[in-house]
Amino acid sequence: MVNMKASMFLTFAGLVLLFVVCYASESEEKEFPKEMLSSIFAVDNDFKQEERDCAGYMRECNEKLCCSGYVCSSRWKWCVLPAPWRR
C-alpha cells in the first residue's frame, strides 16, 4: 500500500509540475507578440523625418528651393523631376 501511495503522489506531483511549466511557457508566448510589435513600431530618433533646407519630390516650392535633381513646377508650384519639355 505504501508503494502505491508513493507512486500516485509522484505521478500527481509530476502532473502538477508539467501543468506549471506549460502555463509559464504559454504566458510567455502571449507576451512575445506584444513585445515584438512594440519593438518593431517603436519610434527611433534615427528614423524620424529630418528638416531640410530644400523641398523634396511633390513638396511645395514657394519659399523653399527644390532639392538637387528636382525642379519647381511653374504651374503647380511643386518640386518635380526634370523632363525634356520642362525648362
Curated annotation (Swiss-Prot):
Residues 1-24 form the signal peptide. It holds the Pfam family Toxin_12. Expressed by the venom gland. Disulfide bonds join C54-C67, C61-C72, C66-C79. Keywords: Disulfide bond, Ion channel impairing toxin, Knottin, Secreted, Signal, Toxin. The keyword Protein biosynthesis does not apply. One of its GO terms (molecular function) is toxin activity. InterPro entries: Huwentoxin-1 (IPR011696), Huwentoxin_CS1 (IPR013140). Residues 25-52 form a propeptide. It is found in: Secreted. Ion channel inhibitor. The presence of a 'disulfide through disulfide knot' structurally defines this protein as a knottin. Belongs to the neurotoxin 10 (Hwtx-1) family. 51 (Hntx-8) subfamily. Hntx-8 sub-subfamily. This is U3-theraphotoxin-Hhn1p. The lineage of its organism: Eukaryota, Metazoa, Ecdysozoa, Arthropoda, Chelicerata.
